[in-house]
Amino acid sequence: MSKHICATVALTLLACASWQAAIAAEQILEFKLVVKLIDPKTLEAPSVEGQVVLLSKAHGVAFFKDGRVASKDFIFSSDYNKGSGPFFGYSTYQFEDGSSITARFAGTQRAGQMTHGEYTVISGTGAYAGAKGTGSFDGVPHKLTGANLLNGKFTITTP
């Protein structure tokens, strides 16, 4: 009987440890982000009033709720008609410790409304090696000239 109890206790402890490890692997990262387009290229569609395609490199700085800072390098493309339409791009957030998160983002801009987009995390390095997950970002009203302010959030799972 005591061997059975010891085995049950050992299996219970192992299951609890595995469950705690799985929970510890999911992280929610909230941040504020300032971004600026670098050398944007715009093309107006001939014979389509208000149709503009934009392609640009961009850079930003993210300030995370936990006090960390990350540099954001990304590419961005949009296809707007009179200020509304789809956009997408690819971002890499580089943290001071060398870890990084790379994500694809996409959304639909509506003229006169704040930006909203969704992230799909596609990879990571360092503390985020093998990361997968999702996220979102929302424009914030501001008085910056030539830059944008956003609130963002990642929900990340690491192996």
What are these regions (language model features)?
Residues 1-9:
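Bacterial N-terminal signal peptides that target proteins for export
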Residues 9-18:
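Bacterial N-terminal signal peptides
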Residues 23-159:
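Beta-strand-enriched cores of mature, soluble protein domains
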